[in-house]
Design a protein with these regions (language model features):
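Substrate-binding/catalytic lobe of Class I Rossmann-like enzymes that use SAM or dcSAM, i.e.
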Residues: 157, 163-253
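Class I SAM-dependent methyltransferase Rossmann-like catalytic core
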Residues: 2-43
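Conserved class I S-adenosyl-L-methionine
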Residues: 43-52
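Conserved SAM/SAH-binding beta-strand->alpha-helix loop
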Residues: 75-76
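Conserved SAM-binding loop of SAM-dependent methyltransferases across substrates and taxa
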Residues: 53-65
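Conserved beta-strand signature within the Rossmann-like core of class I S-adenosyl-L-methionine
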Residues: 144-158
Length: 253
């Protein structure tokens, strides 16, 4: 999903009226960030995973008087612009950028302090991993933190299915464009000839699995070719593109 256009489309999604996670998180942070900062203590190195536009870390870095800030994101072009803005806002704060898939092997620059690290993973992106994958990711975070580290992670909770479905299938079609953009990304990566206009966006809450599922559904019978291969899709056949798990507090803890 997260080429430069995918990242930009996701930023658009966060401003949609149907997409409750962003404004809910903003309200939580506005109400409770001072208490969080007091619990965390000053002088921490903030390591933000999936940093995006870096805006979420700004208030936190100010409140805890951050010693160092590291943005980690998979989209290099998008993140470099965001980090440039962060450096303007925090002229005296050491700032580093790491381009990485956080589910793979990645390392922090040598100059990043090892003591009093805070891994900051806001939003609800941990829900994009199935529970075993989420546990593995949390274990990676634990390894990054060290013995005196702390973790601040956002988790989306189970709620009414109508609210969930609307959040991932908005009336303006921005999430649909985000989903279809995956095909453009695949085209560039493997030389495929997916036509995004031949695919419908489908999103729904799977209550049995406690997750939103996003799919792309073939609008007609079609054939897709790529370097060294091809595949036929029947009308109505789906590609399962993303999950977003929703938790109950006791289940996540």
């Amino acid at each position: 999903f997260y080429d430069a256009r995918g990242s930009a489309l996701f930023e658009d999604i966060t401003r949609l009226p149907e997409y409750y996670p962003t404004r809910t998180e903003q309200a939580i942070m506005a109400a409770h960030a001072p208490a969080m900062a007091q619990a965390l203590g000053p002088g921490r190195t903030v390591i933000e995973l999936g940093a995006g536009n870096c805006h979420k870390a700004r208030a936190l870095c100010t409140l805890i008087q951050a010693r160092h800030y590291v943005a980690v994101d998979i989209s290099e072009a998008f993140m470099q612009a965001a980090v440039a803005g962060m450096r303007q806002a925090f002229a005296h704060l050491p700032i580093d950028a790491v381009v990485a898939d956080i589910t793979g092997d990645w390392a922090l620059p040598a100059q990043v302090p090892t003591a009093r690290r805070l891994v900051f993973y806001p939003g609800s992106s941990i829900g994009n991993f199935d529970p075993p994958q989420a546990q593995a990711l949390l274990a990676r975070m634990r390894a990054v933190l060290g013995s005196d580290g702390a973790l601040l992670v956002g988790v989306d909770l189970v709620k009414d299915a109508a609210v969930l479905n609307a959040a991932y299938d908005d009336a303006a079609g921005v999430t649909a464009a985000f989903n279809r953009n995956l095909l453009e990304h695949v085209n560039r990566l493997i030389g495929a000839d997916f036509d995004p206009h031949q695919w419908h966006h489908r999103a729904f809450f799977n209550a049995a699995q406690s997750r939103i599922e996003m799919h792309l559904e073939a609008a007609q019978a079609l054939e897709v070719c790529w370097r060294g291969g091809k595949r036929c899709f029947a009308q109505g056949e789906r590609i399962h593109t993303e999950n977003s798990y929703k938790y109950r507090v006791q289940d996540f803890v």
